[in-house]
Amino acid sequence: MTLTENHQDKQAESIIGQGSRLCISGLNAAATATVRQVIMELGAVATSFRPGADGIILPDNASGADRAEALAQGFVVFTVSELTRLARGAEEQRSAIEVGDKTLRILDIEIPRGSEKTASDSGRFKHLCLDRLFLTTARKAALAVRHGIPCMLEGETATAKTTAILWLAMLAGQNAVRVNLSGHTDTGELVGRFIPSTQTGENRPAWEFSEGYIPRALRNGWWVILDEVNLAEPQVLERLNPVLELPPTLVLTEHDGRRFGSGGGVPVSENFRLFGTMNPSEYAGRATLSPAFRDRWGIWGHIGKPSEPELLDMLRCLVTGESPAFVWEGVRWIPPRTEPVYPVLSNFPDLEVTLKSIASFHARISGAAGDNEAPASIGRVRRERYVFTRRTLLNAMRLIHENSNGASRLRGVAARVLAEIYIQRLADPADRAAALALLRATGLA
């Protein structure tokens, strides 16, 4: 009996695309690789372990006893064909991005395009993989733009939170201003302060008021990105509460009391938007946001770390320029092809196996460094844990590319670069030995 013929059908479809963990059982290596790709397209996570899994993937020729055993354990059961049917059975197939003269569409969200010549250089985005994780993040920002609601993106470092907003601004033709907050940020930087006068002449004043980023953005219709929000002091953030209201307002009590917005003398541009990014509060030095401040961010997105298959897709995209298609909300989305960054690497016969090993090593050492969900197995005596991010991986790929000239195989080059970028940054010899063991486990060392 197939999945569509039994009582599990609706239950099976309900767990797809919501971060479910699907255990692959009884498949050979080639079939496992194919199924992992399908699982990722569906927005789920592939695992080889049954504990903690939501569903089990069995071979098409699995026995009735195997299926019955999995059902008895409370799992939703798929065969390979059934899983593929769900992935390919989306009612609609659409391009993930559509750039028109007057509008921009990211997945299902359409926003107007402006005509600003932005400071964002499209070349800075050449390393992007337009996968499910990145595009759903950009969609969250586009949703905020469409409805004029302040948007906060929270996630681990180097998960492309700020990049997604800047990329969206570039495509939308909007001027975006990025403000890096810290414990030293004061209200003068954001709202304004008096500075020595720049005027000339005998009667020039000694001081003049210089508006901060927020008043200028309100007037000119800029998008403002407040980076690392929870590094700033609470009293600095609370000064922004009126700007986070709908509609935004601001009274310059620091100067002449002029009012931006409703009932004031300075109108707020309809293009003004406010974004924030932050790492989880468990990070060192991060403040806990007040309930009043947090509540004013009407759209809040939690951005996860890329999984090992997503890391592999990113590496492939750097070489081929192709981002993976994925199923989201019942639609199969097709990202556009981009210019490959390192196309010369495609000439190596061991490219695919090397990229898989690189992605596997990064995922393993990142996990060993620990996160908010799991303790560290390396760097345990340090006050701050080691961090290996997407940025680390991009640096490694750049060095692999630059050192590949004249090499006959890529694996040796990759092993040397990974040792240099990842292992040599570890201070403790025991940690370096543990990291080297992880590298050997991927077959690279």
Residue ranges and their predicted role:
Residues Q8-A12, I57, S63, E69, ...:
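Low-complexity, compositionally biased segments
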Residues M1-Q11, V80-A96:
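Defense-system signaling and execution modules centered on TIR/cGAS-STING-like, death/scaffold domains
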Residues T2, G89-A445:
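C-terminal regulatory/interaction module of P-loop NTP-utilizing enzymes
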Residues D9-R85:
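Interaction modules related to DNA damage response and DNA replication/repair
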